[in-house]
A protein has these predicted regions:
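Beta1/beta-strand and adjacent pyrophosphate-binding region of the FAD-binding site
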Residues: 2-18, 35
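Dinucleotide-binding Rossmann-like beta1-alpha1 core, especially the glycine-rich loop
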Residues: 52-126
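Glycine-rich "substrate-gating" loop/helix at the edge of Rossmann-like oxidoreductase active sites
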Residues: 140-142
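Glycine-rich FAD pyrophosphate-binding loop
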Residues: 27-49
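Short, flexible, mixed-charge acidic loops at enzyme active sites
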Residues: 46-53, 129-130
Length: 142
């Protein structure tokens, strides 16, 4: 562990997605006197970011959120830390399936690659899922 300085221009508490993003963007703006603290050792200090799936769904309810997400993907690619693995959002209720249909309409309108798939298509890639409890899914290649 690095020793802590007695003072800093900026002290960031947390090394999760928000803290790391803040440190990155401040450094991009030319800040150099930054200290970042977290409760545990990196790369997984034990906070909520480390418990997340780390999958990026590029289509949300607004174009603004979709644009922010796509910009995040661009930044991760530039940093060389992005793995394009693809993923499913699975619907087990008709209400959830209707939400996925709305998001697919947005994806198509915004030019974002995504598609609705059948339970059988999901199980081809994720064989431990029970297709009898899935109505359908959205596939995102990012």
């Amino acid at each position: 562990m690095a020793s802590l300085p007695s003072s800093a221009r900026c002290v960031i508490i947390g090394a999760g997605i928000v803290g790391n993003s803040l440190a990155y963007h401040l450094a991009e703006l030319g800040w150099t006197d930054i200290v970042q603290l977290d409760k545990g050792p990196l790369p997984n200090p034990g906070g909520s970011t480390g418990h997340a799936s780390n999958f990026i769904f590029p289509v949300d309810h607004s174009r603004e959120f979709a644009d922010i997400t796509l910009d995040s993907v661009r930044q991760y690619k530039e940093l060389g830390v992005f793995t394009e693995s693809g993923g499913y959002e699975v619907a087990r209720t008709e209400e959830r399936m209707e939400e996925l249909r709305r998001r697919m309409s947005s994806a198509k309108a915004w030019g974002i690659p995504a598609e609705l798939v059948t339970p059988e298509q999901v199980v081809e890639k994720v064989p431990f899922l029970d297709p009898s409890v899935i109505i359908g899914a959205a596939w995102f290649p990012t």
